[in-house]
Design a protein with these regions (language model features):
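A short glycine-rich, Lys/Arg-flanked "PGG" loop and its adjoining helix->strand segment in the class I
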Residues: 136-148
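Conserved class I S-adenosyl-L-methionine
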Residues: 153-192
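A short acidic, Gly/Pro-enriched loop at the edge of an enzyme's catalytic core
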Residues: 112-123
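A short SAM/SAH-binding and catalytic strip from SAM-dependent methyltransferases
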Residues: 121-134
Length: 399
């Protein structure tokens, strides 16, 4: 039996999650903010009309997306018939909401689009590709389901995922880590692990059997750096448009002007380099259909790829009479990022115009390209999620 077949068997035996589903939905599941997914994944576009939840399990993410987008058509798919049956039971209990279409289907199947349909504005795939041997196959299949200008949210394990160290440690006690077998012995060892580790992963010893069977004792794990995930995505025509930790990581570097050695890396390369220095345990990534490096802010403006205001930040302006400059204080409550920059009067005017219009007109970048410092500032804003590079001219504007 292949690792892929064992993974399927594991989730068919123990659908996940099966407890406190209503509470998980109330908390938004594990999905990032829709506003962020839209701002960096689909800049300048209206709310998604069709959403695919790829690898939906028992339906938590699908129910979350319906709550966020009550008018959208939502399709959810999973390879486990038991998981889909569980989700359908919960769906039948819902009242007064637009129905979700639940399907049984294998994301590794080249014909998955025949099962779920196409023309999706947004696809979410959370906690799925970390457990499949060939994630690039799924990434390629999902691209076939996407509408022009659509985006893919990907939630996957990082290099610092607790299981990276935990599994070899459990194996050193003679415990089988490719399948959940000795659950009592496993929980005893996890109790010791919990006592010695405070890595933010919670009390593993108290986790459900379905969680342990997938995230601790499973047949296959891709606990990869962001650079490796990006490489997998680049191979099949995706580029990283942002990650949920990039703004905070980049701001930490910028506070001491250590970000300068990274200039002029595009958002994808920038996020990968910072993750190498400060590995994440889990990646929340927005992907767009674009060649590697195509979303770099250095390629934006002047009739090529438009630059968009993301709306993730509030900005407060104050005049500095002595220096003849304007101080702009940026604040993003969602990511707890705050910083300030000194702008020229001309830069302040064009920034205000961008904030009002939402998209930069032709010639907008000239105020920044006049100096090396201006170019670096615009690049920094792209990494921090203040602005986002749009689709190439002629790429289509549906949705």
């Amino acid at each position: 039996m292949t690792s892929e077949e064992r993974t399927k068997r594991s989730y068919e035996r123990r659908p996940y999650p099966t407890t406190n589903i209503a509470g998980l939905v109330d908390k938004g599941g594990s999905l990032p903010l829709l506003k962020w997914m839209q701002a960096v994944g689909r800049p300048g576009r209206s709310a998604p009309q069709r959403v695919l939840v790829a690898g939906c399990g028992t339906g938590v993410e699908a129910f979350v997306m319906r709550r966020r987008l009550p008018a959208a058509e939502i399709v959810a798919v999973d390879f486990s018939p038991r998981s889909i049956a569980w989700a359908q039971r919960l769906e039948r209990a819902a009242d007064g909401v637009r129905p979700i279409t639940f399907r049984v289907g294998d994301l590794t199947d080249r014909k998955i689009a025949d099962v779920v349909g196409g023309d999706f504005d947004l696809i979410t795939c959370h906690g799925v590709l970390s457990y499949l041997p060939k994630p690039s196959v799924v990434l390629e299949n999902l691209a076939a389901c996407l509408r022009s200008g659509g985006a893919l949210y990907l939630g996957v394990n990082g290099e610092a995922h607790p299981a990276t160290r935990l599994r070899p440690w459990l194996a050193s006690f003679g415990l089988a880590v490719d399948e959940l077998r000795e659950e009592r012995r496993l929980r005893e060892l996890l109790g010791l692990w919990d006592a010695l580790n405070d890595d933010g992963s919670g009390e593993l010893a108290t986790m459900s059997s379905s969680y342990l069977g997938g995230d601790v004792c499973g047949p296959h794990f891709n606990n990869w750096s962001l650079a490796r995930w990006r490489s997998e995505a680049n191979r099949v025509g995706w580029e990283v448009a942002g990650t949920d930790v990039l703004p905070m990581a980049l701001q930490l570097a910028a506070e001491r002007k250590n970000d300068r050695v990274l200039y002029p890396a595009g958002v994808g390369e920038l996020a990968a380099r910072l993750d190498q220095a400060r590995p994440a345990g889990f990646h929340r990534i927005m992907l767009r259909r674009a060649p590697a490096g195509a979303l770099a802010v250095t390629r934006a403006g002047e009739g090529t790829r438009p630059l968009h205001w993301t709306g993730l930040y509030s900005v407060r302006f104050s005049q500095s009479a002595e220096r003849r400059t304007v101080k702009a204080v940026f604040n993003c409550a969602a990511f707890h990022v705050r910083f300030e920059h000194e702008l020229t009067a001309g830069q302040q005017l064009v920034l205000r115009a961008l904030m009002a219009a939402g998209v930069a007109p032709d010639g907008w970048t000239k105020q920044w390209n006049r100096t090396a410092e201006g170019r670096r500032l615009l690049w920094l804003w792209a990494g921090l999620g203040v602005v986002a590079v749009g689709d190439a001219a002629g790429a289509g504007v549906r949705g």
